[in-house]
Amino acid sequence: MIRLLYLLVKPAGMSDETFRAECLRHYEMSHDVPGLHKYEVRLVAEQPTDTHVPFFDIGHVDAIGECWFKDDAAYATYMASDIRKAWFEHGKTFIGQLKPFRTAPVAGDEPAS
């Protein structure tokens, strides 16, 4: 499984309500994207600082998105899709900045991708 995680920041001046609505619309649009196994977006409700290890600040984050792909072939299908390209165009309308990460498992049978 390939998993991509995104830290998302809304554009300056966009209301929380508009950002929430566009996140929901983006989630709903994700169901039609070829090769995309699962998409989830969650709004950041709080950024606690009372951690059990030293805290480091990454700046303000409004939401966290994650995309799942079954394998490299599914990811290639996703990348080539015109529907995915249109989905990304929608993302440009409500995502001011993002920071992507491709993650890898620490245990289990799933190979690091």
From Swiss-Prot:
It catalyses: 4-methylmuconolactone = 3-methylmuconolactone. Inhibited by CuSO(4), N-ethylmaleimide and p-chloromercuribenzoate. The active site is at residue 26. 3-methylmuconolactone binds at residues 26, 39. 4-methylmuconolactone binds at residues 26, 39. The keyword Ubl conjugation does not apply. Its EC number is 5.4.99.14. Optimum pH is 6.5-7. GO terms for molecular function: isomerase activity. It comes from the Bacteria. InterPro entries: Dimeric_a/b-barrel (IPR011008), MeMu_Me-Isoase (IPR018566). Gene3D superfamilies: 3.30.70.100. The keyword Mitochondrion does not apply. It is an enzyme of class 5 (isomerase). Keywords: Isomerase. Isomerase involved in the degradation of 4-methylcatechol. Catalyzes the isomerization of the dead-end metabolite 4-methylmuconolactone (4-ML) to 3-methylmuconolactone (3-ML), which can then be further degraded through a modified 3-oxoadipate pathway. Can also use 1-methylbislactone, but not the isomeric methyl-substituted 4-carboxymethylbut-2-en-4-olides. Homodimer or homotetramer. Belongs to the MmlI family. This is 4-carboxymethyl-4-methylbutenolide mutase.
